[in-house]
Amino acid sequence: MATLFIADLHLSLHEPAITAGFLRFLRHEAIHADALYILGDLFDTWIGDDDPQPLHATIAAELYALHQLGITCYFVHGNRDFLIGKRFARQSGMTLLPTENVVDLYGQKILILHGDTLCTDDLAYQKFRRRVHNPFIQQLFLLLPLSLRLKIAAKMRASSQQANQQKSQQIMDVNPEQVLERLRHYQVKTMIHGHTHRPAIHQVDLGKSYGRRAVLGAWHEEGSMIKVTPQNIELISFPF
């Protein structure tokens, strides 16, 4: 019995090794799981479910094959692929989840999220996030021609990379008070997230007890997953 979590694969046509590694993961690891949770940034960018990229169809087919085996795949939107919608979810057999969600695994309640909402010290990003998550702005963007959406996404990505080079590592990490607030609000002792690309399992002082914050790694040189069993929560890295 095991439930698997992954995040921050940033799949794109420019990184075929990561795509191949993910397909192997689905075929050899995920098929043995009770469920698979993808906590955002499965793709490096997403400009709409109508984008005819062959990569999207390949990933959808592989995820749907997992679905047909009776293994549910849950998806939490990330900061790169927040526009993944119901159409792609149907094609891939994924179940879309809210930004923050409490799941009960083997009798243990766990808060799961992408993680960008915890990085409140990055004021510029949080302002950007509020803007692009406005439903009206999203609808307007999706009405634009694909070619224009591609150009806008590329420009936004370039601006983001340039801005991040000028930010401190501390600003781009989670705010500890936000972690405590979420754990207390949802009345849980365990949190799993991605986004920061800093894989670790942290102990969190809750006052009268201790909690855990498990952080997934990004798929760059190797894969990263968290395996939850009735006995343990384990952070695992593995070669592609």
From Swiss-Prot:
<dbReference type="Pfam" id="PF00149">
    <property type="entry name" value="Metallophos"/>
</dbReference>
<comment type="pathway">
    <text>Glycolipid biosynthesis; lipid IV(A) biosynthesis; lipid IV(A) from (3R)-3-hydroxytetradecanoyl-[acyl-carrier-protein] and UDP-N-acetyl-alpha-D-glucosamine: step 4/6.</text>
</comment>
<keyword id="KW-0472">Membrane</keyword>
<comment type="similarity">
    <text>Belongs to the LpxH family.</text>
</comment>
<dbReference type="InterPro" id="IPR029052">
    <property type="entry name" value="Metallo-depent_PP-like"/>
</dbReference>
<protein>
    <recommendedName>
        <fullName>UDP-2,3-diacylglucosamine hydrolase</fullName>
        <ecNumber>3.6.1.54</ecNumber>
    </recommendedName>
</protein>
<feature type="binding site">
    <location>
        <position position="10"/>
    </location>
    <ligand>
        <name>Mn(2+) 1</name>
    </ligand>
</feature>
<dbReference type="InterPro" id="IPR043461">
    <property type="entry name" value="LpxH-like"/>
</dbReference>
<keyword id="KW-0378">Hydrolase</keyword>
<feature type="binding site">
    <location>
        <position position="41"/>
    </location>
    <ligand>
        <name>Mn(2+) 2</name>
    </ligand>
</feature>
<keyword id="KW-0464">Manganese</keyword>
<keyword id="KW-0443">Lipid metabolism</keyword>
<feature type="binding site">
    <location>
        <position position="79"/>
    </location>
    <ligand>
        <name>Mn(2+) 2</name>
    </ligand>
</feature>
<dbReference type="GO" id="GO:0005737">
    <property type="term" value="C:cytoplasm"/>
</dbReference>
<keyword id="KW-0444">Lipid biosynthesis</keyword>
<dbReference type="GO" id="GO:0008758">
    <property type="term" value="F:UDP-2,3-diacylglucosamine hydrolase activity"/>
</dbReference>
<dbReference type="InterPro" id="IPR010138">
    <property type="entry name" value="UDP-diacylglucosamine_Hdrlase"/>
</dbReference>
<feature type="binding site">
    <location>
        <position position="122"/>
    </location>
    <ligand>
        <name>substrate</name>
    </ligand>
</feature>
<dbReference type="GO" id="GO:0009245">
    <property type="term" value="P:lipid A biosynthetic process"/>
</dbReference>
<dbReference type="GO" id="GO:0030145">
    <property type="term" value="F:manganese ion binding"/>
</dbReference>
<comment type="function">
    <text>Hydrolyzes the pyrophosphate bond of UDP-2,3-diacylglucosamine to yield 2,3-diacylglucosamine 1-phosphate (lipid X) and UMP by catalyzing the attack of water at the alpha-P atom. Involved in the biosynthesis of lipid A, a phosphorylated glycolipid that anchors the lipopolysaccharide to the outer membrane of the cell.</text>
</comment>
<feature type="binding site">
    <location>
        <position position="195"/>
    </location>
    <ligand>
        <name>Mn(2+) 2</name>
    </ligand>
</feature>
<keyword id="KW-0441">Lipid A biosynthesis</keyword>
<feature type="binding site">
    <location>
        <position position="164"/>
    </location>
    <ligand>
        <name>substrate</name>
    </ligand>
</feature>
<feature type="binding site">
    <location>
        <position position="114"/>
    </location>
    <ligand>
        <name>Mn(2+) 2</name>
    </ligand>
</feature>
<keyword id="KW-0479">Metal-binding</keyword>
<keyword id="KW-0997">Cell inner membrane</keyword>
<feature type="binding site">
    <location>
        <position position="160"/>
    </location>
    <ligand>
        <name>substrate</name>
    </ligand>
</feature>
<feature type="binding site">
    <location>
        <position position="197"/>
    </location>
    <ligand>
        <name>Mn(2+) 1</name>
    </ligand>
</feature>
<feature type="binding site">
    <location>
        <begin position="79"/>
        <end position="80"/>
    </location>
    <ligand>
        <name>substrate</name>
    </ligand>
</feature>
<feature type="binding site">
    <location>
        <position position="41"/>
    </location>
    <ligand>
        <name>Mn(2+) 1</name>
    </ligand>
</feature>
<dbReference type="InterPro" id="IPR004843">
    <property type="entry name" value="Calcineurin-like_PHP_ApaH"/>
</dbReference>
<feature type="binding site">
    <location>
        <position position="167"/>
    </location>
    <ligand>
        <name>substrate</name>
    </ligand>
</feature>
<feature type="binding site">
    <location>
        <position position="195"/>
    </location>
    <ligand>
        <name>substrate</name>
    </ligand>
</feature>
<dbReference type="GO" id="GO:0019897">
    <property type="term" value="C:extrinsic component of plasma membrane"/>
</dbReference>
<keyword id="KW-1003">Cell membrane</keyword>
<feature type="binding site">
    <location>
        <position position="8"/>
    </location>
    <ligand>
        <name>Mn(2+) 1</name>
    </ligand>
</feature>
